Regions:
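Ser/Thr-rich, Pro/Gly/Ala-heavy low-complexity intrinsically disordered linkers and tails
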Residues: 6, 15-87, 120-125, 129-132, ...
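Secreted, cysteine-rich disulfide-bonded mini-domains of extracellular proteins
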Residues: 703-772
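Short S/T/G/P-enriched beta-strand
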Residues: 64-104, 150-201
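Short, hydrophobic beta-strand segments
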Residues: 129-135, 272-276
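Sequence signature of WD/YWTD-type beta-propeller architectures
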Residues: 162-710, 733-737, 767-772
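Bacterial N-terminal signal peptides that target proteins for export
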Residues: 1-12
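A short beta-strand micro-motif common to beta-rich folds, especially ectodomain repeats
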Residues: 137-148
């Protein structure tokens, strides 16, 4: 499995001496790696381009650590200074002064050996005690050792960054398929003038009409995701000359002064290096975000304020999704042009993927002659299955571990049973969708000797649990079915035996629950509840019609303004606790009570919080959260603002105006209590194609790496562990250590090094059990 480092420029420098210096107790240890044997810690991991002049980002591995803390005998050995704070100024006027530590033993200064447990914060001379800070903030532990005695002191590093523009700004250009920086908008503006900077440091006037559109207040972001695009309302202010972006947390403070990248000045991305530094300097506290605006008349307005949460972990895997309107394939005809008529241009229906560090998606299934859209993916990342556009009863599998090799899965029954099957995590089995459900191998051959499937069971939108021991589904057919409820059944692969079919949740009359997906713990299931049916595709997301008939208010021609083209399916994301069968709507994820109004929406139910569909859960938790990717037709700030149902290029021109049909990601607290809402406000998934309708994201882990392959964490490795190799670099291995680090293999929680610090064995990996 390849760790998904959405920020792109990742570098990992490993040294055996740094590993030795960094290892401490099982609850600590350095998160970054680097440095040499000449210093007592890791060489810096993240630089910001302002002080050190580049934007390299080192992802933070949890280094191998089998326990064994230093034995402190501090009565005779002391450190000076005690609990110091070092402040580093970066950006336009950088300033950094090393800090000299000294050790005293029985009243005399001695030559101690020095180490630091967090080398990403700086280095310390092993024999000199001279600490040189890097470019991240945080609290480290400095240890002095002399004649068998050790003593420690905390060291706080605070970073203050003041920037005028961004010295490492990306090329705005055309932005690629994913938009500028993978998030759209107008890119970064130039630095503010000296006069504007002086004015921006003044006292602003509050204006309640100035509000953040995106990101949302209290959004939880993972580390290493691409930086978000800040988007705000302007109220009555028509001419903004400059803006101050102020992002602060306990040990990192950033102020960026910018002129507009475009008119109107209504969005600005967070600089990449700043975003990385904020994420890796965070220690669990909320991040304060403020934007202050200077108008052309010299009046200062704001600040617009909110806060975010940074999860202490990176996201893992690849997201596979279908795109309707993609420019990466041209197999459908024809798109509407700017004049509202069919211009003969082809567009694509295809399955795409967002890979490590990308700002744009790549084509996986489909080409210029064949549409490939309806799909499912195995949680282990080995296999994708998708329906053929030329014959809906026929599907194809794609070997994601073998250059996406396509194999046709014939269906002589002609009933589309392989359109949306559940795929076992290892990619070897299919549990069929909708028709009389049965178990098949990945080539479409029925498995013999299967027992326990209820008579005439029709499992619609089925999904395996991450460990392959359960399947959840919409109860579409069979004894007691209603076509509306979520149910589950247990599965034992060794015997192909099914058992314990049970009903989990039935929505109110007239509503239907679809698209279940298990949380990594198997304790809960996320699904959507369709509250308004569009009248034409079950469990869909589309409008009520494409070409309105006279009875629908049109004449059968291309009239996108007609009511049935502007109204469609509504759905909300819920979760159910499997043990108690208590279901709860995820209001924080859905956006209840805080999403901005959708001004372009002409439907009768104009609430964006009811436009959320098709959730799937990343099988690997990270930072104490499960991560859900889902389809939404909500506004994306001021970038995607058209009617939510205008996403089909044949009936609406989306070649230059982004549709709102996009993929979003939300964090869910692990081990939440039944009946509570453990979700958090969602963020826009970076790198998806901006000028296309995107949906049905599958977040899966990448195929594991063999022993001897470089790694960052153990979940990338087939052997289950990521440990130092002969050259000091982290390598995949099957050799079992005395205890497993986070993301390494486990059988029980007792296998995990951090079991006393809340680390437990979840789906075979040591993982945090909840947010810190």
């Amino acid at each position: 499995m390849t760790r998904l480092l959405w920020s792109g420029s990742a570098a990992l420098v490993l040294a055996a001496s740094a590993l030795v210096a960094a290892c401490g107790s099982s609850s600590g240890g350095s998160r970054f790696n680097g440095g040499t044997g000449e210093d007592g810690g890791n060489g810096g991991g993240v630089t910001d381009g302002g002080f050190l002049g580049d934007s390299t980002v080192a992802p933070p591995p949890l280094l191998p650590d089998d326990g064994g803390a230093f034995n402190s005998e501090a009565g005779a050995l002391t450190i000076s200074p005690s609990a110091p704070t070092v402040t580093v100024t970066l950006g336009a006027t950088p300033s950094m002064t090393p800090l000299q530590f000294s050790a005293t033993y029985k009243g005399a200064t001695v030559g101690a050996q020095w180490t630091i447990d967090r080398g990403e914060l700086g280095t310390i001379g092993v024999g000199t005690g001279l600490f040189t800070p890097a470019t991240l903030g945080g609290v480290a532990t400095i240890t002095a050792t002399y004649q068998g005695s050790t003593v420690t002191t905390p060291l706080t590093v605070k970073i203050v960054y003041v920037g005028y523009g961004d010295p490492n700004a990306p090329d705005a250009g055309a932005g690629g398929a994913g938009g500028v920086g993978g998030v759209g908008g107008s890119g970064e503006g130039p630095g503010a003038t000296s006069g504007q900077i002086t004015a921006l440091n003044g006292t602003p006037t509050a204006d309640p009409a100035l509000l953040f559109l995106y990101p949302y207040d209290k959004t939880v972001f993972p580390q290493a995701v691409l930086p978000p695009l800040l988007q705000w309302t302007l109220g009555s202010h028509t001419s903004i000359a400059a803006a101050l972006i102020h992002i602060s947390e306990t040990n990192y403070d950033y102020k960026g002064y910018f002129q507009p990248p475009a008119t109107p000045f209504q969005n600005q991305p967070v600089p990449q290096a700043i975003w990385n530094a904020v994420a890796y300097s965070n220690s669990g506290e909320n991040v304060s975000v403020q934007v202050t605006l200077l108008d052309s008349a010299g009046a200062l307005w704001g600040p617009i304020s909110e806060s975010w949460i940074i999860a202490p972990g990176t996201l893992k895997g690849t997201i596979y999704y279908n795109s309707y309107g993609t420019n990466l394939a041209h197999n459908l005809c024809c798109a509407i042009g700017a004049d509202g008529t069919d211009d003969g241009a082809k567009f694509g229906g295809a399955t795409l993927a967002i890979k490590e560090g990308a700002t744009d998606p790549v084509l996986i299934a489909g080409n210029d002659s064949e549409c490939r859209v309806c799909h499912a993916v195995s949680a282990g990342g080995s296999t994708l299955i998708t329906q053929q556009g030329s014959s809906y009863s026929t599907s194809s599998t794609y070997a994601l571990t073998n250059s996406n090799l396509e194999t046709v899965v014939p269906n002589n029954n002609g009933d589309g049973r392989f359109t949306y099957p559940a795929i076992s995590p290892d990619g070897t089995l299919l549990f069929t969708h909708e028709t009389a459900s049965a178990l098949y191998d990945i080539n479409g051959t029925a498995i013999t000797g299967v027992t326990g499937i209820p008579s005439k069971l029709s499992a619609f939108t089925p999904a395996f649990s991450p460990d392959g021991t359960h399947i959840a589904y919409n109860f579409a057919g069979g004894t007691g079915s209603d076509g509306a409820s979520i149910a589950s059944i247990d599965f034992a692969k060794a015997t192909n035996a099914f058992s314990n079919a049970q009903l989990l949740y039935t929505p109110p009359s007239g509503e239907h629950a679809y698209w279940p997906s298990y949380l990594p713990t198997n304790a809960g299931i996320v699904f959507d509840v369709e509250t308004v049916y569009n009248g034409r595709d079950t469990a869909g997301t589309r409008s009520q019609c494409d070409t309105p008939s006279s009875g629908q208010g049109g004449d059968g021609g291309l009239q996108p303004e007609n009511p049935c083209h502007s109204e469609g399916s509504h759905a909300e994301i819920w979760w159910v606790d499997v043990a108690s069968k208590i279901a709860t709507r995820l209001d924080n994820l859905n956006g209840k009570g805080y999403l901005p109004p959708h001004a372009s929406y002409t439907g009768t139910n104009g609430d964006d919080s009811t436009l959320n569909y098709e959730p799937t859960v990343n099988p690997v938790p990270s930072g104490g959260y499960a991560w859900v990717v889902f389809t939404s037709r909500r506004l994306y700030g001021n970038v995607a603002t058209i009617n939510p149902y205008w996403s089909d290029p044949r009936f609406e021109n989306i070649s230059s105006t982004p549709t709102t049909k996009k993929l979003w990601v939300a964090a869910i607290d692990l081990n939440a209590k039944p009946g509570t809402d453990p979700s958090h406000p969602a963020f826009y998934l970076p790198a998806q194609e901006l000028l296309a309708g995107n949906s049905r994201g599958f977040w899966v882990v990448d195929p594991c790496q063999q022993d001897g392959t470089s790694c960052v964490t153990g979940d990338e490795c087939c052997g289950g562990y990521c440990r130092p190799g002969e050259d000091g670099g982290l390598m995949c291995t099957a050799t079992q250590p005395s205890c497993s680090q986070e993301y390494e293999k486990c059988s029980t929680s007792a296998d995990c090094c951090g079991v006393n610090q809340g680390i437990q064995c979840i789906d075979g990996l040591c993982s945090q059990t909840g947010p810190k």
